[in-house]
Amino acid sequence: MKEDNSLYPLKFQPILKEKIWGGTKLKKLFNKQTDSDKIGESWELSGFKGDESVVSNGFLAGNNLTELIEIYMGDLVGDKIFEEFGLTFPLLFKLIDANDDLSIQVHPDDETAALRHNSLGKTEMWYVIDAEPDGELIVGFKNDCSREEYLKALEEERLSDLLKKVPVRKGDVIFIPAGLVHAIKKGVLVAEIQESSDLTYRIYDYKRTDEHGKERELHTELALDVINFSATKNPKVAYEPKVNAVTPLVSCDYFTTNLLLFNRTIIRNYSSLDSFVVYMCLEGNFIIECENHKILVEKGETVLIPASLDEVSLIPNGEVKLLEVFIQ
């Protein structure tokens, strides 16, 4: 029998990151393998230098994402994307468990990031997987604010008074363009989809200290130039989830994200799309069937569908919830 060396849906080994604010939900809910009780992030799919995801299934197991792009180029990521980004995988996918408040922070846009750090900027979105009853996020300012007001509040330890706190529950979606001040608060679990960048300007960190008694570095000056000081109106993305249909969530220059809720087989045809597709499975499990491949996907797994695959069947075992992400 002829060996099939064509591309197929790829699963990856999660890259688990200990954080000062991390917890145990990622191992409890999503079976992430770790002895640590401080896992804040699982980098599900990353081409970020030094943190490249490694394939865990099929004949390509053991190869990392950058090596695959080098070999398969546009067949893996899409011709247009390969032309623009080369060997850089343009997006980063994470699961984040805030067992304590994250620092209040902001990310630079592409232009500033390129100039200062030779990096992509960071526009991102959050899908709230779960939240404790009092779970909230910080998203921008309550009212329009001047640089002077902001600096004074920072100096007087009352920045919190200026910021917009948004109560959240399971299923809420927040879009965070570069420049928007934000933070995940204690008790919130999110899926994060972002540009492939690890640039964070930390504005305030509650005077927390690390194991050596040192406070983490703040980036007050760097942040000042990139902050959007306008009031945040309605930070939540409005959407009506439909079963056995595609529900659009976010569409921006960097990524398009849809919600798929299904309890019967659905067929997704990507023949007109010049992009890879990523599935983040948040609830249930299902089989991806395409060409000569059948791949089981469990809750908490992330899968890369290569751009060369035009059509996939998603066969659920009960109810399934997943995020579908690509670049248009």
Positions of PLM-derived features:
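An exposed, glycine/acidic-rich loop-and-rim segment of catalytic or binding clefts
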Residues: E156-L162, V173-F175, L180-T232
